Each structure stands twice: as C-alpha cells, then as structure tokens.
Amino acid sequence: MMLRGNLKQVRIEKNPARLRALESAAGESEPVAAAAMALTLAGEQAPPPAPSEEHPDEELGFTIDIKSFLKPGEKTYTQRCRLFVGNLPTDITEEDFKRLFERYGEPSEVFINRDRGFGFIRLESRTLAEIAKAELDGTILKSRPLRIRFATHGAALTVKNLSPVVSNELLEQAFSQFGPVEKAVVVVDDRGRATGKGFVEFAAKPPARKALERCGDGAFLLTTTPRPVIVEPMEQFDDEDGLPEKLMQKTQQYHKEREQPPRFAQPGTFEFEYASRWKALDEMEKQQREQVDRNIREAKEKLEAEMEAARHEHQLMLMRQDLMRRQEELRRLEELRNQELQKRKQIQLRHEEEHRRREEEMIRHREQEELRRQQEGGFKPNYMENREQEMRMGDMGPRGAINMGDAFSPAPAGTQGPPPMMGMNMNNRGTIPGPPMGPGPAMGPEGAANMGTPMIPDNGAVHNDRFPQGPPSQMGSPMGNRTGSETPQAPMSGVGPVSGGPGGFGRGSQGGNFEGPNKRRRY
C-alpha cells in the first residue's frame, strides 16, 4: 500500500494541442516520453469517474506516484529542476503562480518579479519539470502567452585537463570539499572514452565561487600524477528549445534576409565565388585549429615524458636521501651505543671503586673498634695471642706451662746440671752466679724446669732460693704463721730472669702474697 504523501492528483488532458506538446516533449527525453505515455494510457484505461456535485466543472484526474518520475540515484529539488517563467501578468500573486504548477508536485522555491514580468520555480525532479515545461509553455494566462524555459545554472563549473582515470564519482568526491554537489559528469565521446573535460553543478553559488577561486590560485590535483585541473565558469547553452520562429524579432534586417528561400549557389556566380571564399576561410581555421591541437598534444606528450623522467629522478633522490638519513641514524645509534657502553664501564668502575673503598672502610673501622675495645678493657690477649704464647713457652708437661716439681710431683731422676729456676725456661737465660751445685734433677722431656728438691728440707728450714727475703707476710698468707720454723737467710744475689737483674721474676712487688707453689703469674 503506497503512502499518501507520494501520491498526487494529476489532470488528464483531452486537448489535442496538449497531446502534441507532450509528444514533442517525449521525443526529446525518454523519461518525459515514459511519463507522457503513462499519462495517456492511464487516461485511456481509467474509467470515467462521476463528476463532483460541488464542482461539476472540475476536470477528471487520476492518482500517480511522484517517485516514479525520479531516476535511480537522482537528487530532488536541484538546480536542474528550476524553471524560468516569462511574460507573466503584472497582477499575478504567489498563490496563483503556485496553483499553476500544483499538479506537478510540491515546489520548493518560488520567486516572482512583477515589475519585469518573470519568475522562477523549482520542482521535485527533472522529469516533472520537463513535463510542466512541455504543458505550460505557450499557455495563455490573462491574455498573455507564458514563456517557460529551464533556468540557467549559475553554480555550474567546467573542469578541464582531467586524467583518463577520473570518473564521475571521483570528480564529485573531489569537489565536495567546497560544498554540496548536485551533479558531476565526465564527458565522454561516442565510444565511451574520456575527453578530459567535465562539469560540476553545485547546489548554490558560494561553493562554486569558492571552488573557482581556490583552483585558480592553487594547483588542484585529483590523482597521483601532478596534473592540475583547469576550472572555468560553465557556458550556458540552450540546446533543447533553441530559437523558435515565434520568438524572432521581425526587424528590417529580418525581412531583407528572408526575401530568398534556402538554395545552392550556382558555379560561376557572385554567390558561389564568395561562398567558396567563406569555405576556404573555414578550412584554414580548421587546419590552424588542428595544427594548434597537434602542437598542444605534442607539448603535452613531451611534458608527460619530462615529468616521468623527473619523477624517477625525484624518487631516486628521495631514496638516496632516505638511505643517507638511515646511515646517519645508524651512525648516531652506534655512537649512542658506544657512549652507553662507556657509561656502563664508568659506572662499573665507580661501583668497584666504591665497593673497594667500603671494604677498606669496614676493615679500618673493624681495626679501630678492636683497638678501642682493647684500650677500654685493658690488656686482654685474645685466643690467638694465648695460643702464640703457649707455643712460645713450649709444652712443659701435662701440668701446664709451669710444671714445678715438688714433693707431690717429683721430677724424673737424672743428673742434668743444676736445678733450673721455677717456671723459667733455660733458653736465652743468663747463668746465676754462686757456688756450684751438685747434681740435681734432670730436665723434663718438655724442656720445662722441674725442681727436684723439696721446698722444705728435713730440718724444717725453708729455702729462699726462689723468693728473696721481703717484708713480713700479710695476714691471710699461708706462710704467715710459721713462727720459729723459718730462719732468716740472706737473699741470693743475682737471682732473676736475666743475669744481673733484679731478684725474683721482676714483675710487681716481691713482697706480695704467694698462695701456692704452682700458681701462675698474672699478666
């Protein structure tokens, strides 16, 4: 079911003059012929409806679809659908003007100049405009015959120097950047080959003016080839209606030229001589045009060859520049890589130097800490120093560094010289002056001094060979309460660790308490 918006009540003409006008218009355009045939067939086949009681004089009509008059892809209300209506009455109104074209669809533009007696109207499609022109041209309106023509397209441009690969769609796409394009056509010859020319029709004049200025000032390229298009205003020709006899002005020149009918000039006459000269002039013009066209064609071919060679040279130059740029970039990348390697080496060296400095700092700090601890805690030899001292003193037996022979641990018997000093090694020691001693106990296998004689003889006298006579012993000393058992003896001169040195071991006061025979000395 068709929409009512696409339907239109159209009047069927019974006038033979109108039918002849439709036939003449149908001979000019196939769409118009189809529309006229549809109107005629519909008028013949449609049953005559009953006349309306309210309007008995209303002419008969039928309903048609307006969309059937549109070509596939055709745009509506374009400049090509615009009609010029001349010889209008001066008192015509806009409503009367619209009512004149209401049977051909809804118009979109209506303009009337009553002073000069003309107007413009734009219909929906080109086919409807052609039908309206064919029907209304010459119609008497208020005793004045109407003159209807297609209006000149003021927004149309001619495009030259087109490439053979340019199509209608590409041409429309290229010029759409200046404004809405209604139609773009590439002109071809009878074989369908592009002639290098075309035309573009815009919807309004400002975009056409903009395209004309931009293409004239710059070089507008449509394809890869640097071949700019030439844009010019389109020359308007009326090749449909031409100049009918009824529009000719009957001047004196008109009547003079129309005195003789069309004829062929007879050879040898005045007419034939000058007619031949006119033909020779036209032939010369034709030859010159052909020569000019030939020169232009050769110049174009030469320019295309030079352009192709220059394009190859330009491409080679671009390739060389790109190669040089890549080489420069590679060299720069290599330099950056070398700089990065140098930086990494420097950073590694700095890290190694920092690590070494930190280790030295740690070692120095450790030594300072050790020295500080030794200074704070006094002379306390560590384990390694004790071991070194023990190795230096030598193993003197299973009892320790000092293995003093006494009554409870007698030394092995033997005659090995005088008894050594208690706790003293005989190496690097000076001799003790005094009377020679008898045979004493032998040295132990460890080389330590073993005193074989008991510290207290049988008579109870205490020998003072080891300790010189000192002040009275302090209280608490184990030797302090032996009254009457000890007789004072003279101290042995020269007894000491070194010959001629002080008595005793030379450490501290000799008058100190001695708590036991095997007590080790303090450090």
From Swiss-Prot:
Belongs to the PSPC family. Forms heterodimers with NONO; this involves formation of a coiled coil domain by helices from both proteins. Found in a RNP complex with CAT2 transcribed nuclear RNA (CTN-RNA). Interaction with NONO is required for its targeting to paraspeckles and perinucleolar caps. Interacts with SFPQ. Part of the HDP-RNP complex composed of at least HEXIM1, PRKDC, XRCC5, XRCC6, paraspeckle proteins (SFPQ, NONO, PSPC1, RBM14, and MATR3) and NEAT1 RNA. Interacts with ALKBH5 (when acetylated); interaction with acetylated ALKBH5 facilitates recognition of N(6)-methyladenosine (m6A) RNAs. It comes from Mus musculus. SUPFAM superfamilies: RNA-binding domain, RBD. Its main location: nucleus. GO terms for cellular component: cytoplasm; fibrillar center; nuclear matrix; nuclear speck; nucleoplasm; paraspeckles. Residues 124-357 are annotated as: Sufficient for paraspeckles localization. Residues 472-490 have a biased composition (Polar residues). The modification N-acetylmethionine is found at residue 1. GO terms for biological process: activation of innate immune response; innate immune response; membraneless organelle assembly; negative regulation of DNA-templated transcription; regulation of circadian rhythm; rhythmic process. It is found in: Nucleus speckle; Nucleus, Nucleolus; Nucleus matrix; Cytoplasm. Isoform 1 is strongly expressed in testis (leptoten spermatocytes, round spematids and Sertoli cells) and moderately in cerebrum, cerebellum, lung, spleen and ovary (at protein level). Isoform 2 is strongly expressed in kidney and moderately in salivary gland (at protein level). RNA-binding protein required for the formation of nuclear paraspeckles. Binds to poly(A), poly(G) and poly(U) RNA homopolymers. Regulates, cooperatively with NONO and SFPQ, androgen receptor-mediated gene transcription activity in Sertoli cell line. Regulates the circadian clock by repressing the transcriptional activator activity of the CLOCK-BMAL1 heterodimer. Residues 230-357 are annotated as: Sufficient for perinucleolar caps localization and interaction with NONO. Changing residue 199 to A: Abolishes RNA-binding activity but not AR-mediated transcription coactivation. PANTHER family: RNA RECOGNITION MOTIF-CONTAINING. This is Paraspeckle component 1. Residues 460-523 are annotated as: Disordered. The modification Omega-N-methylarginine is found at residue 507. Residues 497-514 have a biased composition (Gly residues). Keywords: Acetylation, Activator, Biological rhythms, Coiled coil, Cytoplasm, Immunity, Innate immunity, Methylation, Nucleus, Phosphoprotein, Repeat, Repressor, RNA-binding, Transcription, Transcription regulation. Pfam families: NOPS (PF08075), RRM_1 (PF00076). Residues 282-376 form a coiled coil. InterPro entries: NOPS (IPR012975), Nucleotide-bd_a/b_plait_sf (IPR012677), PSP1_RRM1 (IPR034522), RBD_domain_sf (IPR035979), RRM_dom (IPR000504).
